[in-house]
Amino acid sequence: MTLNRAFKARGVVVHSVLRDSPVHTRDLAQAGIPYDITKFGGPLDLWTKGRLRKITDKFRPDVVLTFAGRASSYMPRGDYALIGRLGGYYSLKYFKRCDALICNAPDLVRYVVEGGWASDRVFHIPNFPRIEEATPIDRVSLDTPEDVPLALALGRLHPNKALDVLIKAAAIVPNLWVWIAGEGEERQKLENLSRDLGVSDRVRFLGWRTDKAALFDAADLCVYPSRKEPFGNVVVEAWGHGTPLVTTNSTGPSWLVRNGQDGIVTPIDDVDALAKGIVTVLSNRELAAKLVKNGRQRISDEFSEEAIVSQYLDLMEKLRSERKTQCVG
């Protein structure tokens, strides 16, 4: 949705195709972006490819940008440039029809090139955060005192996100309260862990949220303890919303964050180090202000919407022109 909105704001005619999702279709409708629904099912889905052919025949796109494997594998070839966009270490067999690939992190570029793609067909364009003005959410509405140190964590409740490490750190840091915004298969396990460690009264599981800005603005810091993270959207979101960041040296954050300058970086799975990083930020207002200032500067210099969208548009125009020449020839 973030890219769709940004493209539309730059005058691009956008048409989205997606699985049925009430949240996403509502957002598309509110943004005035037309869309179609299809299944993107498994191997027995014989309907989606024909559906996509009908949609492209009607819409006549210059460029098709696909996200993840299934959309790329189902997309029929046409006189448009077909670009796959990778935000993870997906199987490259699904992207064989693509003219080029966009990766949001340098390590994904390495992965794709080592997987056999020509380096001149693989491009690095990072993500940008969607920054919104918001009133900080009332802590009391989420059963949280106003005067306690509060850490915010966002993401799918999955082992890769290492939210168990954050909960263990909360048991070490005196009176630290934690908001966990996200949903996933680890929820029951994480709730049980918080009870076992005696911190369930200080850990709030918020489920999926659409009010990220209000959550960021209410928190004292953002903690992003991932074990495996190719890019790290939460990093740039924390920077964009002016929230001090504590993270780990997983692949994406270790590339993004300059330790001690725009975030605190700790080793993966090191509970004590994560707890120490949290305490350092909470106890040193001067450092916290420095992290916020430098994070905002990184957004302005490297990860602004204007700069990133311009990279997309320039590349799409280049590939569109190449594809048209091939089709005419």
Per-region residue spans from a language model:
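Short His-centered aromatic/hydrophobic patch
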Residues: 44-48, 65-72, 86-87
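A short, well-ordered alpha-helix in the C-terminal region of glycosyltransferases
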Residues: 273, 280, 287-302, 308-314
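Short hydrophobic beta-strand element within catalytic cores of glycosyltransferases
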Residues: 17, 244-247, 257
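Aromatic "clamp/platform" in nucleotide-sugar-dependent glycosyltransferases that forms part
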Residues: 208, 227
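Acidic anion/phosphate-binding donor-loop and adjacent secondary structure
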Residues: 47, 113, 119, 128-143
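A conserved nucleotide-sugar
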Residues: 11-15, 163, 167-204, 283-288
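Conserved acidic donor-binding segment of nucleotide-sugar-dependent glycosyltransferases
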Residues: 259-260, 264-271, 280-286
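A conserved mid-protein helix/loop that constitutes part of the nucleotide-sugar donor-binding site
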Residues: 1-5, 149-172, 185-192, 272
